[in-house]
Amino acid sequence: AQETIDSGKRFRARELGIIIGNYPTGKYNAITDVAGVKIGHVTLISGSGKLVPGKGPVRTGVTAILPHGGNIWQEKVPAGGYILNGCGEMTGFIWMEESGYIETPILLTNTLNVGTVMDGVIDYMIKTVPEVGISDDTVNPIVAECDDSTLNDIQGRHVTQEMVLKAIESASDGPVEEGCVGGGTGMICYEFKGGIGTSSRVLPEKEGSYTAGVLVMANQGRRRDLIIKGLPVGKEITDLLSASRKGYGSIIIVVATDAPLTSRQLNRISK
């Protein structure tokens, strides 16, 4: 039987006939269409009802992005970036700009868990590169954040260092789980439920056949500003509104490509 929107399945835009952009997608329409890229999530969902700071409800997690399956410290990857505004924040950004590469996995989580997640990445790096900080340089982890405190007991800082290791070590290629998973578990987007999203596009052969993939942790926007293919969807869907959150939120966007680009060129792509 043909599936309907009421069937309980979560549809992706293209499954509903909404085609965005001019280029075809990769096999999975995900950042993992870029060869070597791996994604891992650890998702925390527990409790309900009124907020009890330090206890719950818990709606949070951590997402790991690995540029390849090898030793990232020994096989560094060219990188660039761009800051649209100060939130979300990202550790390791200055060193990435200065050096022109990344040398650790990229982790996404909530604002108050950044420190713990950094510790988890450092544990992972020491485990895989024992000479870090002894006979080799120290490490500057890349951890990006958004504020999930509307839905999550953010003061509880429920993500642990062990969960960070699990997200990194369980990362895989292939289809990417989206929505309320990993770092995106407690996020809100245009006053709908937000979270993790991903897509990819493949250039035609005459343009190099390169692949670009994107993964976002979406936690931004007011309902009235949501536009899809030129249609003011947010202004049409005026019900289903939850309690308003503080501010306008933020978004973290990670772009990967197999095109042979320098750090300067990657800076431009990130813009």
Task: Kindly label every feature range from the protein language model.
Residues 2-271:
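Alpha/propeptide regions of enzymes that mature by internal proteolysis
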